[in-house]
A protein has these predicted regions:
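Pepsin/retropepsin-fold aspartyl endopeptidases
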Residues: 1-132
Length: 132
């Protein structure tokens, strides 16, 4: 699967293209979620509103306080089914509130374990194949 780099909505530097992909989240199939590929992140981080829209109950999930990207947020973990380019996988996602970003983060344990990813910054392209 090949994806072009994209502008990240809500950022001050809209002239930069970033490695971001549209992920279909189980429970909200008609609204693909823009996700930044974050090789430095261990976990997937999504806005908590995504869990609510997907019908995921976080009331019994343990909560952690996390500092990242210049803000502090409360995160609760739950498994989430996701699809990218026809490949579906289930991985843990930390749903965060507040979440001031207009995109989500895909990290090592929730994304990169499942895919072979080649970032081609010179041509603003991401080449992704599922791990077999």
């Amino acid at each position: 699967m090949k994806f072009p780099f994209k502008e990240l909505p809500g950022t001050l530097s809209s002239d930069y293209l970033r490695p971001a992909v549209p992920v279909i989240v189980e429970g909200i199939p008609r609204a693909p979620q823009l996700c930044l590929l974050d090789t430095g992140a261990l976990h997937n981080r999504f806005g908590a509103w995504t869990a609510e829209a997907a019908g995921i109950d976080l009331s019994d999930a343990d909560e952690q306080r996390v500092a990242m990207g210049g803000f502090v947020t409360n995160a609760r973990q739950a498994p989430l089914g996701m699809t990218l380019g026809g490949f579906t996988w289930e991985a843990p996602v930390w749903f965060c509130d507040p979440w001031p970003l207009a995109f989500h983060l895909l990290g090592q344990e929730g994304f990169f374990l499942w895919f072979n990813v080649r970032l081609r910054a010179a041509v603003y392209e991401i080449d992704i194949t599922p791990e077999t």
